[in-house]
Swiss-Prot record:
Belongs to the RecX family. Pfam families: RecX_HTH1, RecX_HTH2, RecX_HTH3. It comes from the Bacteria. Keywords: Cytoplasm. It is found in: Cytoplasm. Its main location: cytoplasm. GO terms for biological process: regulation of DNA repair. This is Regulatory protein RecX. PANTHER family: REGULATORY PROTEIN RECX FAMILY PROTEIN (PTHR33602:SF1). Modulates RecA activity.
Length: 266
């Protein structure tokens, strides 16, 4: 048994307290605890504590320190359960204590993967042009379950996805593209697929926001590609065969047969 003889607040952290006990005729430092543990365990001057009690007090203090670490981590933004668990492991917290803290945070609704997923999707929709498949991937990387992700994605309807793609396409209209209208559309389609939109959503958006080069710009692009193809094949082919090679090259670039014939007949 040991008797607590003195309790002092720490100079650098007024939420932690140093506990002193009587030993060999004098006061000696025994351990320190968080204020929450001090109150919960009823620590006070004159209290007798045995080795088992001290062990429990120190365990509670480790739990509280880990809880405080998690709260600090959560103070910057919402996190998934997986993110908090990973963070605490990196801080060398023990597994049983981590699970204890995660359970406590969840009970207090400070951790909620469904709320996190919904907030994550809402923020990304407002600040980026990412589609549902990309958002699903990013949430999975944060350890959110597929069931939870699917539930949260119901807030991002098909119609809203189409509208978001249309808004993105409108922004692309003012950009310069040296190529055919078809090649431009294909390039934008690839970008949208990479952003996480499905083909049906993309096609519906294109139907409402047609992507087409100005005729003069497309004609200039065709001539540039045509001249390049002519130089490439001129040393190998002549006459009709040369024209066919150039025609094939331009067709692969997405130019219409009508424009290609016009170029070759000029």
């Amino acid at each position: 048994m040991a008797i607590i003889t003195r309790i002092e607040v720490q100079k650098r952290n007024n939420e932690r307290y140093n506990i002193f006990i009587h030993q060999n005729g004098q006061d000696v430092y025994a351990f320190s605890v968080d204020e929450q543990v001090l109150i919960k365990q009823g620590l006070r001057k004159g209290l007798d504590i045995d080795a088992e009690q001290m062990k429990q007090i120190l365990y509670e203090d480790e739990v509280q320190k880990t809880f405080n670490l998690a709260l600090h981590y959560l103070s910057y933004r919402m996190r998934s359960v997986h993110e908090v668990r990973t963070y605490l492991k990196k801080k060398d917290r023990e597994e049983p204590i981590i699970e204890h803290v995660l359970h406590r945070l969840t009970e207090q609704r400070l951790l909620d993967d469904h709320a996190f997923a919904e907030a994550f999707i809402q923020t990304k929709r407002a600040t980026t042009s990412k589609g549902p498949l990309k958002l699903k991937q990013e949430l999975a990387e944060k350890g959110v379950s597929e069931k939870t992700i699917e539930g949260a994605l119901t807030t991002f309807s098909y119609e809203e996805q189409v509208e978001q793609v249309k808004a993105w396409l409108e922004k692309q209209k003012g950009r310069t593209f040296k190529g055919s209208s078809l090649a431009w559309k294909q390039k934008l389609s690839r970008q949208l697929l990479a952003k996480g939109y499905t083909s049906p959503v993309i096609e519906e958006a294109f139907a409402d926001v047609p992507i087409k080069q100005e005729e003069e710009e497309e004609w200039e692009a065709l001539k540039a590609f045509g001249e390049k193809a002519m130089r490439k094949y001129a040393g190998k082919k002549t006459g009709w065969e040369l024209q066919q090679k150039v025609k094939q090259a331009l067709y692969r670039k997405g130019f219409s047969l009508e424009m290609i014939e016009r170029y070759l007949n000029d």
